[in-house]
Amino acid sequence: MTKILLIKTGAAGDVVRTTVLLNALQGSITWVIDSRYEPILPTRHPNLHRVVALDHAQATLEHEIFDHTISLEEDVTCALLASKIPTKKITGIYLENKRLVYTNDAAGWYDMSLVSALGAVAANEVKKQNTLTFQQLLLNMFGLSFNGEPYCIYRNNQIKAEQRIIGIETRVGARWPNKGWSGYPALINKLQQLGYTCRLLEQRNNISEYLDDIAGCAFLISGDTLAMHVAMAYHIPSIAIFNCTSPAEIYDYGTLRKIISPQLNQAFYKTHFSQAVIDSISVEEVYAAFLQHTAINSLQKA
């Protein structure tokens, strides 16, 4: 069996979407991850041999030889690890003359990244023009086609969705403030008038508790965030608002409806906050998308 070293430490949403590799690759995978996000990974999977915290990875793995190292972090520490652990082949990011570089088979993805060999301006333009999903770009690194392989993450099967509960994630990370949306309060009011209970997702003591909160929802509304990816992993119907990040990269798995800001091109991956951007999608548009979602009939009958 092919012995694979997979280095993908964060962020949480990126870890979720990278789990498609568990279902797409054949081999014995050792996954190096930030210990904060380890609870996201499934407790068991036939291709997931073990999970190693990044802090202990060098000492744990330095005497092993891998058939294939997959290095997916644009980070010096992770690239150094990928360069040091003995392997027969590497795909992705590694260090060369103290610089982050990437292998040719990973260029489809990393040409659009912060470490792009094309330079920042060209990389952003390539990303803007891209029509492939992350899953397609990821599997292309290995000469594979994406055939709808699902995410595979932790789930507490004792938790069942409550049919009138709508999860709402209003929070966004500091890096992309324009992922936010100003219409949540008004939307929540409209949904409550229909008899739904809106569950505002909050910071939890650990990430598994946060995932459990989502698992108890019958529907989810958010920006392009971890919650969106978890909803798709759990087959929870959802709506996601795209103000500044690429909607093309997100495969919808038949459960996600995307609402795209008319200011997307102007705000594309901009890191400075713009009130006009987070105001650019109307409450009526999101409300209508909710009512038109194919899953709503089953919710209304509950």
Where on the chain are the PLM-derived regions?
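Catalytic machinery of carbohydrate-active enzymes
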Residues: 1-302
